């Protein structure tokens, strides 16, 4: 036997290298085969519900890192709630209708307009489901736990029927109407868009300054006067029917020396406009308030059949332009509102593809709206005073990335204005985890217009509306419920398969159809109505869920998307928000803080991370950032997170190895019988347990990460485990001192594994497989530990906080001695302490082997004053010299008692007593050489 064999060197097969990329799929299959999600749900049956409702990602392509962050966050919450006494089911969902899928099929060569619509919709459905299953596999690869066999998908018959019923309730309450108001119109998609489908980019546009000649000045202006107008959308002049001024803005009538014409502009802008137009020696002839100009009539710049009326509008400012804007009610919301109020014609001169129509005039017909500037300039002639290129923020179609226009077309609307206050009141009852989130959603609802819910596309849920022979729209409670029942059985494709009369209740009649003939609506619903109905399609319809949900968790862009549409439909139906809490997340940026883009090549695919590091590292990264704001991610950042993971893993591996001979049923030492340092570590660990439990409850992942890493690095690695080897390796295997420390080790190991499970389930299960004495076969079936408190806890903490200060001072003394070449390693030191009464009392209270805690070979607590050479602090001084004696071959301490023993071992008296007591046979025979 060799002397080293008398040491209790930790033994474990738990590997240092995690091998996550290859092992994770194996564990995931094991969990699936063991039906862990279902078993967890069975364990939680009857417990209070916590329902996190999954906002459905769009089913197109593999998931990106933003999806990963969001869904890992959801998984951490679901797992932590499931292990904290809650019934927390997770039903993943997908949004499956809409233009992107139509675009994919078009790229694949599918020609929608050349094939049967039902066949086309079948292709859309097949593609959408293929993407659902692809993304489902992506999410499962992240280690997510959920009901993967009972997903919710917005194209299923039960979901579509639930959506129709949401619409029906809104129609019954009078919230659905048809109008020809201007809406966001995407010529690239040939469809209306909702606000949530708009994103803003900088766009360079041509702005024109031109003049309208006064036709009837109402006794205020002469007919040789011109009113100067500004526009950034020249094509809309073709539909201009008025000029709008601000009622309280001052306007001046001026005569430039270089002009025979007189002009009206905003007084505040005269100087800048004179410079822009090249006017010199400008004479101000009169000043008017805007309201004085009301109802003056001007000529259209070129259309002699059209007069343009001067009207008042609150939206006019003097921030730019001339203080006067032309008004085309068919091409703008403000224009429409003031135009309708003043009886102006709502003219639309652009078709659904962005092409100018015949009513724009023969010179314009057939041109693309954005290419007509030269023609407009030609038509204006000498009425054009200036033109310039401006860069401004402009709305774009979020899918096609093309600019959009406002365009008045007949559409179906949800009248938000009718129940706006009810929505705002509902917001006040929701808990927001960021105050700005509440303000943002509140302001969006307060300021938004009515919701355009119709779309001129094919792939979606049809609007359940019929038309009588006289054109009357029919959407009664009876007809809508009948459609819902048909969809529930056959799916929404039946709308296209059957004639209108076969979709109506049997025997249905209507006074507007004396011949019994009906037509059906061909528009579909906005996809935000699809996902915005999920509270009914999922929360209300699934037996193990609750409505409202406890939590909605999505990206901050969903304040204008899913949070918004879900809120509107839920309040419209039931008067309550569909969620009790909202937690939002920022965007994922690259390592430099730049937006990720395939064109920039700075995207990170979750699959690439899984191959290089493992999903576990991505999960740990999620907790390492404050995801309520935008966060950065790169392979370098993930490499740093991987180092943190390695530190966590190796620390826990040390605990596994050094409790391999510990049976908690037999070897646990009661708290009251622990050494003071072990009590301290137990208390510190339970403080960590409380911090993590509280942070899980508040969804504060970064708090968990920081607390965990700090405990492992500072409390364990830099202190407790730093001197632990001197106990667990050196002392007798069954000695009280070793069992005391192993008790703490095992307690930390078991509980920290449970605490880690929501974040690192793969690693936690791997550790758990080495804990043979724990009852549950999977750690995921256990409960998170409760934080304990202990008698005299604060006193113990105060004592050890003071000792840590003392330890820091001692380490400075050792460092000085090391720099002076007095010692090399700290075990070569004999440390002499010159304490005052406070420190002396402290060291007595610590009641431990202080030399062992400081990792020095010898320590003397001296009486009397410290020598001048001592390193002095306020309460204590130190001197350091080389320890006397010889190095013990077993404990490596320098000890005066170290000597050659009769059994061929050079060891100190302490080690000799351990060896002689525990290894009598080896002592009798003598140890082998090293």
Swiss-Prot record:
Motif 'KMSKS' region, chain ranges: 595-599
Catalysed reactions, as listed in the record: tRNA(Ile) + L-isoleucine + ATP = L-isoleucyl-tRNA(Ile) + AMP + diphosphate
A GO molecular function held by the record: zinc ion binding
Protein residues bound to ATP: 598
Residue positions binding Zn(2+): 888, 891, 908, 911
Keywords: Aminoacyl-tRNA synthetase, ATP-binding, Cytoplasm, Ligase, Metal-binding, Nucleotide-binding, Protein biosynthesis, Zinc
Organism superkingdom: Bacteria
Motif 'HIGH' region: positions: 57-67
UniProt subcellular location: Cytoplasm
Listed CDD domains: Anticodon_Ia_Ile_BEm (cd07960), IleRS_core (cd00818)
Main location group: cytoplasm
Top class in the EC scheme: ligase
Keyword Ligase part of the UniProt annotation: yes
Subunit structure: Monomer.
Domain notes: IleRS has two distinct active sites: one for aminoacylation and one for editing. The misactivated valine is translocated from the active site to the editing site, which sterically excludes the correctly activated isoleucine. The single editing site contains two valyl binding pockets, one specific for each substrate (Val-AMP or Val-tRNA(Ile)).
Reported function: Catalyzes the attachment of isoleucine to tRNA(Ile). As IleRS can inadvertently accommodate and process structurally similar amino acids such as valine, to avoid such errors it has two additional distinct tRNA(Ile)-dependent editing activities. One activity is designated as 'pretransfer' editing and involves the hydrolysis of activated Val-AMP. The other activity is designated 'posttransfer' editing and involves deacylation of mischarged Val-tRNA(Ile).
Similarity comment: Belongs to the class-I aminoacyl-tRNA synthetase family. IleS type 1 subfamily.
Protein name (database record): Isoleucine--tRNA ligase
Annotated source species: Streptococcus pneumoniae (strain ATCC 700669 / Spain 23F-1)
Name of the coding gene: ileS
């Amino acid at each position: 036997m060799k002397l080293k064999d008398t040491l209790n060197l930790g033994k474990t097969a738990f590997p240092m290298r995690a091998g996550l990329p290859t092992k994770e799929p194996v564990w995931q299959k094991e969990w699936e085969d063991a039906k862990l999600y279902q078993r967890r749900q069975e364990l939680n049956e009857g417990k209070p519900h916590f329902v996190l409702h999954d906002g459905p990602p769009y089913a197109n392509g593999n998931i990106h890192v933003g999806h990963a962050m969001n869904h890992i966050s959801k998984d951490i919450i679901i797992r932590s709630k499931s292990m904290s006494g809650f019934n927390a089911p997770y039903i993943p969902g997908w949004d499956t209708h809409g233009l992107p899928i139509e675009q994919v099929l078009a790229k694949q060569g599918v020609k929608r307009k050349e094939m049967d619509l039902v066949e086309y919709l079948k292709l859309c459905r097949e593609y959408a489901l293929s993407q659902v299953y692809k993304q489902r596999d992506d999410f499962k690869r992240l280690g997510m736990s959920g009901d993967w066999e009972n997903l919710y998908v917005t194209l299923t018959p039960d979901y579509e029927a639930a959506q129709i019923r949401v619409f029906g309730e809104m129609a019954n309450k009078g919230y659905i109407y048809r109008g020809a108001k201007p809406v966001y119109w995407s010529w690239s998609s040939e469809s209306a868009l909702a606000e949530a489908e708009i994103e803003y980019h900088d766009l360079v546009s041509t702005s024109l300054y031109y003049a309208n000649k006064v036709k009837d000045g109402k006794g205020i202006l002469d007919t040789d006067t011109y009113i100067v107008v500004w526009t950034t959308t020249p094509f809309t002049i073709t539909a201009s029917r008025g000029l709008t001024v601000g009622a309280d803005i001052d306007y001046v009538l001026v005569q430039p020396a270089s002009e025979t014409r007189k002009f009206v502009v905003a007084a505040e802008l005269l100087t800048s406009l004179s410079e822009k137009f090249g006017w010199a020696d400008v004479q101000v002839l009169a000043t008017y308030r805007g309201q004085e100009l009301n109802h003056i009539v001007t000529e259209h710049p070129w259309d002699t059949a059209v007069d343009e009326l001067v009207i008042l509008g609150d939206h006019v400012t003097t921030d730019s332009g001339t203080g006067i804007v032309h008004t085309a009610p068919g091409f703008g919301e403000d224009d429409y509102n003031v135009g309708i109020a003043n009886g102006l014609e709502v003219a639309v001169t652009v078709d659904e593809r962005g092409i100018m129509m015949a009513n724009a005039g023969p010179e314009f017909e057939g041109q693309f709206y954005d290419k007509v500037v030269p023609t407009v300039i030609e038509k204006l002639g000498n009425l054009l005073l200036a033109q310039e290129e401006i860069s401004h923020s402009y709305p774009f179609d979020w899918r096609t990335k093309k600019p959009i226009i406002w365009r008045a077309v007949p559409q179906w609307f949800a009248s938000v204005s009718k129940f706006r206050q009810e929505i705002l009141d509902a917001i006040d009852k929701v808990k927001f985890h960021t105050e700005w989130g509440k303000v943002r959603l509140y302001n969006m609802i307060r300021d938004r217009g009515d919701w355009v819910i119709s779309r001129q596309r094919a792939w979606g849920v049809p609007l359940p509306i019929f038309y009588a022979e006289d054109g009357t729209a029919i959407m009664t409670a009876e007809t809508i419920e009948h459609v819902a029942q048909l969809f529930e059985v056959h799916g929404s494709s039946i709308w296209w398969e059957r004639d209108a009369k076969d979709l109506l209740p049997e025997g249905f009649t209507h006074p507007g159809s004396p011949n019994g003939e009906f037509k059906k609506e061909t528009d579909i619903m906005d996809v935000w109505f699809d996902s915005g109905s999920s509270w009914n399609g999922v929360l209300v319809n699934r037996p193990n869920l609750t409505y409202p949900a406890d939590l909605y968790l999505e990206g901050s862009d969903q304040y204008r998307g899913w949070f918004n549409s879900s809120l509107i439909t839920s309040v419209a139906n039931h008067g309550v928000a569909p969620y009790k809490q909202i937690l939002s997340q920022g965007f994922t940026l690259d390592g430099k803080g730049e937006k990720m883009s395939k064109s920039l090549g700075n995207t990170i695919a979750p699959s690439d991370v899984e191959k290089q590091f493992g999903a576990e590292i991505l999960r740990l990264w999620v907790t390492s950032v404050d995801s309520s704001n935008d966060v950065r991610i790169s392979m370098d950042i993930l490499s740093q997170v991987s180092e943190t993971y390695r530190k966590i893993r190796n620390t826990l591996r040390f605990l596994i190895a050094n409790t391999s001979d510990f049976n908690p049923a037999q070897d646990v030492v009661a708290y009251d019988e622990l050494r003071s340092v072990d009590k301290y570590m137990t208390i510190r660990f339970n403080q960590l347990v409380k911090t993590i439990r509280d942070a899980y409850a508040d969804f504060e992942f970064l708090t968990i990460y920081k607390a965990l890493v700090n405990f492992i690095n500072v409390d364990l690695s830099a202190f407790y485990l730093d001197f632990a080897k001197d106990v667990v390796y050196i002392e007798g295997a069954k000695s009280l001192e070793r069992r005391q420390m192993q008790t703490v080790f095992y307690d930390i190991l078991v509980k920290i594994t449970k605490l880690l499970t929501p974040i690192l389930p793969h690693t936690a299960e791997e550790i758990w497989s080495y804990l043979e004495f724990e009852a549950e076969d999977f750690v995921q079936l256990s409960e998170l530990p409760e934080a304990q408190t202990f008698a005299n806890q604060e006193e113990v903490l105060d004592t050890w906080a003071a000792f840590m200060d003392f330890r820091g001072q001692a380490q400075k003394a050792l460092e000085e001695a090391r720099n002076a070449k007095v010692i090399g390693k700290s075990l070569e030191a004999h440390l002499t302490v010159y304490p005052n009464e406070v420190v002396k009392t402290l060291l007595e209270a610590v009641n431990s082997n202080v030399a062992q805690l400081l990792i020095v070979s010898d320590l003397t607590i001296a009486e009397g004053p410290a020598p001048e050479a001592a390193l002095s602090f306020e309460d204590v001084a130190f001197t350091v010299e080389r320890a006397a004696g010889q190095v013990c071959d077993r404990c490596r301490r320098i000890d005066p008692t170290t000597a050659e023993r009769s059994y061929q071992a050079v060891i100190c008296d302490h080690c000799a007593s351990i060896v002689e007591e525990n290894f009598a046979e080896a002592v009798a025979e003598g140890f082998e050489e090293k």
